[in-house]
Regions:
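N-terminal Lys/Arg-rich, disordered targeting/topogenic segments
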Residues: 1-15
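N-terminal pre-catalytic segment of deacetylase/amide-hydrolase enzymes
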Residues: 32-134, 328, 332-337, 533, ...
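Metal-dependent polysaccharide deacetylase catalytic core of the NodB/CE4 family, i.e.
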Residues: 82-87, 91, 134-135, 155-288, ...
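His/Asp/Glu-enriched short active-site or ligand-binding loop at hydrolase and phosphoryl-transfer sites
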Residues: 165-166, 221, 273-338
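Low-complexity, Ser/Thr/Pro/Gly-rich disordered linker/stalk regions
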Residues: 340-405, 603-654
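Secretory/extracellular carbohydrate-interaction modules
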Residues: 386-499, 620, 640
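Carbohydrate-binding surfaces in secreted/extracellular proteins
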Residues: 409-411, 475-515, 521-561
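Flexible glycan-contacting loops in extracellular carbohydrate-active proteins
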Residues: 554-601
Length: 654
């Protein structure tokens, strides 16, 4: 290489280094500006917050309503958590630490006192009395990190909880699950006692949503493919092992021997590692109507659990347990990630009829609104509006608005359910202009709303459907082959998966563009949503934007019957909605964050909280930081894991 070329190359390196430095500096300055602006806006949001959160009794909230259940005579309630996390973006069944703190606070304020497993045993065996508001608290996931996050709340409120374990993991010091030593450490405090989820967490008779047989899966395999399933699978102890035609592959005696082995192994491990078998058992899965999906399996489970355990939680979805309940057929209410505090308390009220405390939040923000039904919590970001069971929640802004206005709101209630804004409404919230999100469809309605002015399917709005049914089915088979190769221990099964993978990689799969039928995902009650809605009313026209995209431009509307603004939340009625975990929910949380209203010139008329700048800048900052990582580590954008080369991207849009 001659001297000129070397000099030219070095000059290029200097220029590139200068440019890279300038870009990094710009990113840092942008980040600092976003942080300062976010903190400034946070001060705006928090200046009006009360020192303590206000609680209100349920009397006025539920007046005129009847709870579905009645806690008459001796009883207790059971509340469980499938896991605790600090990350609010985890989703699914895992509750955040912040939500746990608020829910425990409300339970304590409602007078609930935790009881032990022995209290429950004595209650059923000896008819010993329980406290008036007896609560059995359970942490189900068996992960040590969840217990660590929950511990401060137990200490603060002098509560005790049962932490469940898997016997198989008692000696696995390198895993996430609670070991024998950790269980002993927890039990040495006065805040924990040990329960059991069984020997293992594994799945049998698994079929995907297209009825393809996926076989029997361990935990890691199931987690990799569960997005391709409906409810067509079972836990290890709940049925006979079956083949692709759903025919038994084991005799009755083989089934009984297989199930007995798990219980006997549990007994052996717990005795060796802990010195005792925990009293509390949670048979997975719940809500089968018995102790398994087959009567013979149910009989064997009943025999074995009564031999080794003192009590069993067999049902999920309601919290009330009466004296005439079976100690081996108890029920717990599992708080979900999407449960607000008031959601949990509304479910408890509906199960028991107890006088409970609801969370009002910021009473100064609450003073701007009139409650018509349901219950509202006024938070730092906005309003969480919780419906009555199988009903509605409705509030009215206590200030008259002009006919012409510009409104922006962030809607973060789950997809399954209804959240709505009604503008230009009369004093009853009727005869106005309504923008409603209902089961992932946006409706623009006027008056009684018999014929919507606009009906927008939000899957299509987002660019979907993204895959054909054939592609989705292919994705599931591909994911199964990869996870078996990565996580299975059966060499024959791994070889079969490798052969299947080779065949799949040579397949030509028709997409939507090829005329194949689109795949439309079924909504689950756990599905979250996050939309920014803008509404501009001017005379007899309305314009709307969703996530920055205009969806209505000067649509003709009437003057309405008043100048009121109502917010509504309502549970989806008519039929049980799909839940992969076989649960239904008769309460809905509408979440109205960052509500801002101005006149057409931009003068503020009402504001709950601005949309933080960091929300808008977050995508840019993340992308910039990813670029920096690639820059300094020499990562080529075109290099991906082999699995990602072969399968269709589930999250990306075309």
């Amino acid at each position: 290489m001659d001297e000129k070329r070397i000099k030219r190359k070095n000059t290029f390196k200097v220029i590139r280094s200068v440019l890279e430095t300038l870009i990094i500096l710009a990113v840092v300055l942008w980040g600092l500006w976003s942080l300062v602006e976010y903190r400034r806006q946070s001060r705006v949001m928090t200046d009006s917050l009360p020192v303590t959160c206000v609680m209100i009794p349920s009397d006025e909230i539920v007046f005129g309503y009847e709870s579905a259940g009645k806690a008459q005579g001796e009883h207790f309630i059971a509340i469980s958590y499938n896991g605790i996390t600090e990350n609010p973006r985890v989703g699914g069944k895992i509750v955040t630490k912040a939500s746990l703190e608020k829910q425990i606070e409300a339970l304590k304020a409602s007078g609930y006192q935790t009881i032990t497993q022995q209290d429950v045993i004595n209650f059923y065996r000896n008819n010993d009395p329980l406290p008036d508001r007896a609560l059995l608290l359970i942490l189900e996931d068996g992960i040590m990190y969840s217990a660590e996050l929950a511990q401060p709340e137990l200490v603060k409120n002098n509560y005790i909880a049962t932490v469940c374990t898997f016997a198989q993991n008692m000696s696995d010091a390198h895993g996430l699950y609670i070991t024998a030593e950790e269980a002993k450490m927890l039990n040495q405090t006065s805040y924990w006692e040990t329960g059991s989820n069984g020997y293992r967490l594994s799945y049998i008779n698994v079929f995907d949503r297209f009825e393809n047989y996926f076989g029997h899966l361990n935990t890691a395999e199931f987690l990799d493919i569960h997005n391709y399933l409906r409810r067509d699978y079972n836990h290890y102890l709940m049925d006979f092992l079956r083949d692709e035609n759903r025919l038994r592959t084991e005799s009755v005696s083989e089934m009984e021997e297989r199930i007995a082995w798990d219980y006997e192994k549990m007994n052996e491990i717990y005795q060796d590692e802990l010195g005792y078998v925990p009293g509390l058992y949670i048979l997975m899965h719940s809500n089968t109507g018995a102790f398994g999906n087959d009567p013979l399996v149910s009989m064997k489970n009943a025999e074995m659990m009564e031999k080794y355990f003192s009590l069993n939680f067999n049902r999920q979805g309601t919290c009330l347990n009466m004296l005439d309940s079976s100690i081996y057929d108890l029920s717990r209410l599992q708080s979900r990630q999407y449960f607000s505090t008031n959601h949990l308390m509304m479910r408890i009220w509906d199960d028991t009829g107890h006088r409970v405390m609801f969370r009002l939040g910021d009473e100064r923000k609450a003073a701007d609104w009139e409650r018509r039904s349901g219950v509202a919590e006024y938070t730092e970001e906005g309003i969480i509006l919780t419906s009555m069971p199988y009903g509605q929640a409705k509030i009215r802004l206590l200030r008259e608005l002009p006919k012409n206005l510009d409104l922006t709101v962030r809607l973060q209630g789950n997809m399954v359910g209804q959240q709505a804004l009604i503008l230009r409404a009369d004093d009853n919230g009727e005869n106005g202009i309504t923008v409603r999100l209902h089961d992932n469809v946006l409706y623009l309605e006027e008056g009684a709303g018999e014929q919507p002015l606009l009906e927008l399917d939000l899957l299509q709005f987002d660019g979907g459907p993204f895959f054909s049914k054939a592609q989705e089915e292919y994705n599931g088979k591909l994911a199964l082959a990869y996870t078996i190769i990565a996580n299975d221990t059966d060499e024959d099964r791994i070889r079969a998966a490798e052969a299947e993978l080779e065949q799949l990689q040579g397949a030509v799969v028709p997409g939507i563009a090829d005329g194949a039928e689109p795949f439309v995902p079924e909504l689950d009650i756990d599905d979250e949503d996050d939309r920014i809605l803008r509404i501009r009313l001017e005379g007899t026209s309305i314009s709307c934007w969703l996530d920055g995209v205009q969806i209505a431009d000067g649509q003709r509307v009437g003057a309405g019957s008043g100048n009121n603004l109502f917010l509504e939340a309502e549970v989806t009625r008519g039929s049980e909605r799909f839940s992969q975990t076989n649960l239904s929910d008769d309460v809905y949380d509408g979440i109205f964050n960052c509500l801002n209203i101005t006149d057409l010139e931009g003068k503020s008329l009402y504001s709950l909280a601005p949309i933080p700048v960091s929300e808008d800048a977050g995508g840019f900052l993340t992308a910039a930081m990813d670029w920096i990582v690639r820059l300094f580590h020499g990562i080529n954008n075109n290099v991906f894991f082999r699995m990602e080369q072969e399968r269709f991207a589930r999250e990306s849009k075309p």
